[in-house]
Swiss-Prot record:
Gene (name only): accD
Protein name: Acetyl-coenzyme A carboxylase carboxyl transferase subunit beta, chloroplastic
Top-level taxon: Eukaryota
InterPro entries: AcCoA_carboxyl_beta, Acetyl_CoA_COase_Trfase_b_su, ClpP/crotonase-like_dom_sf, COA_CT_N
Cofactor dependency: Zn(2+)
HAMAP family: AcetylCoA_CT_beta (MF_01395)
Sequence similarity: Belongs to the AccD/PCCB family.
GO CC annotation, single: chloroplast stroma
Length: 489
């Protein structure tokens, strides 16, 4: 990844902080080993200088001289003086309380102050022969040229340190990467937007167009086209990327409909038992929300009747029986309806001699149905035994993140071939449950797909792009061929 740099000077009364931010700093945790730039310095008004030697190398996550927990007090109402790597200078002002954010090149007052201060203090302590990429003997006024690079750097800084949510629109060529948010979360972290007359953002070039930040709420208005990575917060076009972040490689959750579209040939899907709806068999009582209301809310949110879609279709021309769990429906929990739909699908595949695919994405048994949900584990295991042992048919289990609890203990680990997605979280008991029960820390990554593969619990880890082709080859290897020979891929 190409890294660009800019200098940022904070004017804050007694101290001047000068640091450098990388274009790639998106989170608190380091992406790789960090090497600190060695020409950092703090220079106070009493001429106390703390310095290091020559620069060693770039780094790709934030390393500020200001403690992040004190960042609110530090920048509560301040003007920033910014100089990019092209030695262009800008004035950046924002006020947390008033939700005001402005970038302009009116540097008359700031230039006088900084030029005077730098001439008397900073330049006297730096030799002009130093090989500093960002050394500048003067700070000059320039035309306003706030490019996509500086927007991205400031955006990453704000996003990772002060939880900002609305977007700043750049006039650069790649504007969808230069969103700078215009409001800052409250101290409680709730992120609630506070309306104010200053909830406007000024555009880059001519500063004549004032637009409300609400017009650019991309995740709400265009969520059918774009998806935001919950690891690096980048926006991705979901149809092309298959919900895989190309920046950090993070695998985002997919709905059951998206997985059906990924695996099944267009126009060949036929759903089964779509009218089955969960009841409240044990009259589960909850102070927060009754079980029936939770079911209705999940149905409205997902458009599904329960946490799984089952049916038949063709995979590269090969007839298959497919069941796909949906984590968005009450965490993909397995209740009586989910168990019945899976059981009926397996029985249908047994009678029709179809290969079977079950895609797991679940938190386990549904506690609102008590022991009835636990019964589904035994019921599914029983029909799978008949399908595999008696009929000698072929079952592929695909484990996605997360797959835990009763689903892991039953249908998840009973496949003839067990495939997992990269980085999938797969476990019987969750990390928190183990730590609270055993009073021991669970090693990081011990419940990830890669760790389970090394221990022999999985047969393969397959990314989403080649998944359909891999499954098709496995079916043909086990004598399941396309109805039309021309459809072999």
């Amino acid at each position: 990844m190409e890294k660009s740099w800019f200098n940022l000077m904070f004017s804050k009364g007694e101290l001047e902080y000068r640091g450098e931010l990388s274009k790639a700093m998106d989170s608190f945790a380091p992406i790789e080993k960090t090497t600190i730039s060695k020409d950092r310095f703090i220079y106070d008004m009493d001429k106390n200088f703390y310095g290091w030697g020559e620069r060693s190398s770039y780094y790709n996550n934030v390393d500020l001289l200001v403690n992040s927990k004190d960042i609110r007090n530090f920048i509560s109402d301040d003007t920033f003086f910014v100089r990019d790597s092209n030695k262009n200078s800008y004035s950046i002002y924002f006020d947390i309380e008033k939700k005001k954010f402005e970038i302009n090149n009116d540097l008359s007052d700031l230039e006088i102050f900084f030029y005077s201060y730098c001439s008397s203090s900073y330049l006297n302590n730096r030799s002009k022969g130093d090989n500093d990429l960002h050394y500048d003997p003067y700070i000059k006024d320039t035309k306003y040229n706030c490019n996509n690079h500086i927007n991205s750097c400031i955006d990453s800084y704000f996003r990772s340190h002060i939880c900002i949510n609305s977007h700043f629109l750049s006039d650069s060529n790649n504007s969808n990467e230069s969103y700078i948010y215009n409001f800052i979360c409250s101290e409680s972290g709730s992120g609630k937007i506070r309306e104010s007359k200053n909830d406007k953002i000024r555009t880059n070039s001519n500063r004549n167009n004032l637009m409300s930040s609400k017009d650019f709420d991309i995740t709400k208005n265009y969520n059918q086209l774009w998806i935001q990575c919950d690891n690096c917060y980048g926006l991705k076009y979901k149809k092309v990327e298959m919900n895989v972040c190309e920046e950090c490689g993070h695998y985002l959750k997919m709905t059951s409909s998206e997985r059906i579209e990924l695996l099944i040939d267009p126009g060949s899907w036929n759903g089964m038992d779509e009218d089955m709806v969960s009841a409240d068999p044990i009259k589960f009582h909850s102070r927060e929300e009754p079980y029936k209301k939770r079911i209705a809310s999940a149905q409205k949110k997902t458009g599904l009747t329960d946490a799984i879609q089952t049916g038949t279709g063709q995979l590269n021309g090969i007839p298959v029986a497919l069941g796909v769990m949906d984590f968005q429906f009450m965490g993909g929990s397995m209740g009586s309806v989910v168990g019945d739909k899976i059981t009926r699908l397996i029985e249908y595949a047994t009678n029709q001699c179809l290969p079977l695919i079950l895609v797991c994405s679940s938190g386990g048994a549904r506690m609102q149905e008590g022991s009835l949900s636990l019964m589904q584990m035994a019921k599914i295991s029983s029909v799978l035994c008949d399908y595999q042992s008696s009929k000698k048919l072929f079952y592929i289990s695909i484990l996605t993140s997360p797959t835990t609890g009763g689903v892991t203990a039953s249908l998840g680990m009973l496949g003839d071939i067990i495939i997992a997605e990269p980085y999938a979280y797969i476990a019987f008991a969750g990390k928190r449950v183990i730590e609270q029960t055993l009073k021991k820390a669970v090693p990081e990554g011990s419940q990830a797909a890669e760790s389970l593969l090394r221990k022999g619990l999985l047969d393969a880890i397959v990314p989403r792009n080649p998944l359909k082709g891999v499954v098709s080859e496995l079916f043909q290897l086990h004598a399941f061929f396309p109805l039309n020979k021309n459809e072999i891929k």
